[in-house]
Swiss-Prot record:
Domain of life: Bacteria
Phylogenetic classification of the source organism: Bacteria, Bacillati, Bacillota, Bacilli, Lactobacillales
Provenance organism: Streptococcus pneumoniae (strain Hungary19A-6)
UniProt: ATP binding residues: G10, P11, T12, A13, V14, G15, K16, T17
Sites annotated Interaction with substrate tRNA: T101, R127
Entry similarity comment: Belongs to the IPP transferase family.
PANTHER family: TRNA DIMETHYLALLYLTRANSFERASE
Record note on quaternary structure: Monomer.
Protein name in the entry: tRNA dimethylallyltransferase
Gene Ontology biological process: tRNA modification
Pfam family, one: IPPT
C-alpha cells in the first residue's frame, strides 16, 4: 500500500510555505522542504526559509542540512526525503512536501531506482535533452522508437523514451507514494508584484549582507549559483550599481517563476489553484480531507 503524501508546489513567492504550515497544523503533519537552496546553512534570507517561529510551530525537514561548501543533488534529495517521509509516517503523521524545485520533487514521486547501473546524472541529462522538443517532435520520436502511448501527453512520452533509452534500469522503478499535488498560481501581474515586493523585503531583512558573506567566502560553490545571490555579485565587484543589481535580481526571479510554472504544468500531474480567488484555502483543505479519507 502506497503512502499518501501532500505535495505543495508553485512558483517562488506564491505562498507555499504558509499553506504547508496550515495543512500541517490541520492534519497533524510535518513539512519536508523540496527546495534545492534551503538545504544550506547560513543562507536564510535569499532562500526564503520558514522563519524560526514557523519552524518552531511545525516541524520542518531538509532545511540547514549542508554547509555552503558542500554539493547537493537530486540523488541526495530523493535519498534523504525517502528516509524523512518514512520517519514521519512511522510516528503517525502526514508528510507534506513543499517547495519549488520541480526536478527534485518529480524524481521523488516517480521513484527512480537510484541504485541501478545507470548513473542518476545521466538520466537527468537525457531528460533535459528532451525538454526543447515540441509535442509533435516527441510524438515522432516515440513513433520512431516503436513505442505505443495511449492518450499521448508530454509526460508519458518522455517517460517512455527514457525507459526505452536506459532499459530495465528505469523500468524497475519503485513508486512508494500516492501524492495529492497542489500547485499554487496567481495572475501573472499579481505574481510579479509579489515577487518584486518580496525582494524588497529581503533587502530590508539583510539580504545584501548575507550575499556579501557568501561572495567573500565561497563565490564559486554550488550554493552561490542559486537565484538571490549571484545576481548581486556584479555589484560587489563594482560592475553594477546597487539599483541595477536589485532590478537584475527581481528580473531573474520573475523569469525563474515562469520556468517553474512551465515545469509543473508540463511535467507533473497537478491541481492548480489561483491564490487570488475567494475561499481558495478552504477548497484546498477540503480536497486534502477528501483525499486522506478516501
Amino acid at each position: 500500500m502506497k503512502t499518501k503524501i501532500i505535495v505543495i508546489v508553485g512558483p517562488t513567492a506564491v505562498g507555499k510555505t504558509a499553506l504547508a504550515i496550515e495543512v500541517a497544523k490541520r492534519f497533524n503533519g510535518e513539512v519536508v522542504s523540496g527546495d534545492s537552496q534551503q538545504v544550506y546553512r547560513g543562507l536564510d534570507i535569499g532562500t526564503a526559509k520558514a522563519s524560526p517561529e514557523e519552524q518552531a510551530a511545525v516541524p520542518h525537514h531538509l532545511i540547514d542540512v549542508r554547509e555552503i561548501t558542500e554539493s547537493y543533488s537530486a540523488f541526495d534529495f530523493v535519498s534523504e526525503a525517502k528516509m524523512t517521509i518514512e520517519d514521519i509516517q512511522s510516528r503517525g503523521k502526514l508528510a507534506i512536501i513543499a517547495g519549488g524545485t520541480g526536478l527534485y520533487i518529480q524524481s521523488l514521486l516517480e521513484g527512480y531506482h537510484l541504485g541501478g547501473e545507470t548513473p542518476y546524472e545521466e538520466i537527468l541529462a537525457y531528460r533535459a535533452s528532451l525538454e526543447p522538443y515540441s509535442d509533435e517532435e516527441l510524438a515522432h520520436l516515440v513513433e520512431q522508437a516503436g513505442l505505443e502511448i495511449p492518450q499521448f501527453n508530454r509526460r508519458r512520452a518522455m517517460r517512455a523514451l527514457e525507459i526505452a533509452h536506459f532499459g530495465q534500469d528505469l523500468e524497475n522503478q519503485e513508486i512508494l507514494y500516492e501524492p495529492l499535488i497542489i500547485c499554487l498560481d496567481d495572475e501573472r501581474s499579481q505574481l510579479y508584484e509579489r515577487i518584486n515586493h518580496r525582494v524588497d523585503l529581503m533587502f530590508e531583512a539583510g539580504l545584501l549582507d548575507e550575499a556579501k558573506w557568501l561572495f567573500d567566502h565561497s563565490p564559486n560553490v554550488q550554493a552561490a549559483k542559486g537565484i538571490g545571490y549571484k545576481e548581486l555579485f556584479p555589484y560587489f565587484r563594482g560592475e553594477q550599481t546597487f539599483e541595477e543589481a536589485r532590478e537584475s535580481l527581481k528580473q531573474a526571479t520573475r523569469r525563474f517563476a515562469k520556468r517553474q510554472l512551465t515545469w509543473f504544468r508540463n511535467r507533473m500531474q497537478v491541481t492548480f489553484y489561483q491564490i487570488g480567488e475567494s475561499g481558495v484555502q478552504d477548497r484546498i483543505l477540503s480536497q486534502i480531507e477528501e483525499f486522506l479519507d478516501d
